[in-house]
Amino acid sequence: LERATTYQSWFDDILPGADIVLYDGSEPLYLDLQNGRVDLIMTNPMKAHLKFLSKENGAGFEFKGPVVDEEKYFGIGVGIGLRQGEDELKGRLNGALKTLINSGELETYARKIFPFKLHKGEWGQ
């Protein structure tokens, strides 16, 4: 696990006493996994995909297990930063996202880029 992350907080609360190794960044985490010094890692799926799994050194590794996304630790999702007072733009963005989600197009587009669902579920679905 990366030190001082929400994943460390989750482990401390949910799996107290678990034998974990803490890292000061993601690169050493991926190196130890690749070289067999750890059996698994837990990190942000987007980061894992972009920095490791989609690269040559990430070949042979994959997402496993259930999605860990308790709101208490990980919030309600990602967001888009806007300047205060951009209410019209916020409304347009929310409307567009709602349309894409309801039609299934967001998931279709995301599947072209990421090997995991953007919404709750098991990896690889």
Task: Name what the model sees in each region.
Residues 1-125:
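Proline/Glycine/Serine-rich low-complexity intrinsically disordered segments
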